Regions:
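Conserved nucleotide-sugar phosphate-binding/catalytic loop shared by glycosyltransferases and other
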Residues: 2-13, 32-83, 158
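Structural beta-sheet core signal
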Residues: 7, 37-38, 122, 145, ...
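Short amphipathic alpha-helix
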Residues: 15-27
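Donor-nucleotide binding loops and adjacent catalytic segments primarily
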Residues: 43, 48-52, 171, 178-220
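Glycosyltransferases and closely related glycan-assembly transferases
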Residues: 85-98, 106-121, 134-139
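Active-site-proximal region of nucleotide-activated glycan assembly enzymes
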Residues: 114-182, 187
């Protein structure tokens, strides 16, 4: 019987939100299971995870250099420290499975779990898998992806885990789109009779979108 699970992921909301959605579902369906989240002090998880009510264990942030630089020489030592910290989190929590969502924290979590013979389960949110999940997928017990086109061997398409609050909004709109739109406009203080343009973007791309839309606001 599953008693403890460690969820690893962080850095951006793209990793943290699906992680929290899974954590919430585990807590709802298996209230006896202990849930620990593994992240970093620098990522969004440092705020989002505790505010959601889950304990957060941290590891040092170890970005993988994409180009040859002095950082390559520091990588082995930094990665070793992160793997040790991830291993301590697995041991102290008694985790029987590690579920990873990608990001800097997932690589040391996967490596520490492998050393201990703890099963690894992976979810990849993006169409193009990140380095951590490409590595972990080599020995993961199961791999889930959002998109059918994601190139990870043996992956099962599950879609993107959504928090129940978000799923409820989707269901509300499907049931009555007009009423859902009117309700949302009123909550945001907008005129329901006027067109509404929503512009959204993630991570670094959001800044470019914000600047472009701000510059074009008068014309729009």
């Amino acid at each position: 019987m599953l008693k403890s699970v460690l969820l690893a992921g962080g850095g951006t909301a793209g990793h943290v939100n699906p992680l929290l959605a899974v954590a919430d579902e585990v807590a709802r369906t298996s209230p006896g299971v202990s849930i620990t989240v593994l992240g970093t002090r620098e990522g969004l998880e440092a705020d989002l995870v505790p505010s959601r009510g889950y304990p957060l264990a941290v590891v040092p942030k170890v970005p993988l250099p994409r180009r040859p630089s002095a950082a390559w020489f520091r990588l082995p030592g930094r990665l070793r420290a992160a793997v040790e910290a991830a291993g301590d989190a697995i041991d102290s929590s008694g985790a029987q499975v590690v579920v990873g969502f990608g990001g800097y924290v997932s690589t040391p979590a996967y490596l520490a779990a492998r050393r201990r013979g703890v099963p690894v389960v992976i979810h990849e949110q993006n169409a193009r898998p990140g380095l951590a999940n490409r590595l972990g997928a080599r020995w993961a017990r199961a791999v889930a992806v959002t998109f059918p086109s994601t190139a990870l061997q043996g992956a099962v398409v599950t879609g993107l885990p959504l928090r129940r609050e978000i799923a409820a909004l989707v269901e509300e709109r499907a049931a009555d789109a007009a009423a859902s739109r009117r309700s949302a406009a009123e909550r945001l203080g907008l005129d329901p009779s006027m067109p509404v343009l929503v512009v959204t973007g993630g991570s670094l791309g959001a800044q470019c979108l914000n600047e472009t839309i701000s510059a074009l606001a008068a014309e729009i």
